Amino acid sequence: MILNHSAGLPALITRVNEGGFFDWDYMVELLENEEPFWTPGEHTGYHMMTTGWLIGELIRRITGKSLGQYFNDEVSEPYNLDYWIGLPESEVDRVAKVTPFKPSSNDKPSGFATAFRTDPDSMQKLSLTNTGKYDYNAKETYRAEIGGVGGITLSLIHISE
């Protein structure tokens, strides 16, 4: 259910405290206590932010390693990739800033975009705004192990080969 996005937790309804995305145990506890949007397994919805904690916590409980350490040990190091979940301080200056997407006035809004704009309680809106003031261009964000949206790479071509 986690890998196919049917766990029912694509976003958190419970308000995330400021800085909450940087506290692994806090985020796991929120997810453990969250009421699913649907009965797990019955529907799908993209778990863009939450998937990192859901998968990462399984990895931590099975291996004892954090998501970033596991990824480094099992993927980045063996394949000699510049790819991190939790960027080392030594690499921070290599990161390009993310620029938000700005649709053209001719673009027809997707169902996701329509829900995001019109329903403040939708999973679409909550998944992108209930983030504890997460800033994807902050150095602390680069260093955090936020698996759903925190992977940083210079090795995409190697991953796809």
Annotate each language-model stretch with its function.
Residues M1-S160:
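Short, surface-exposed loop or secondary-structure junction motifs
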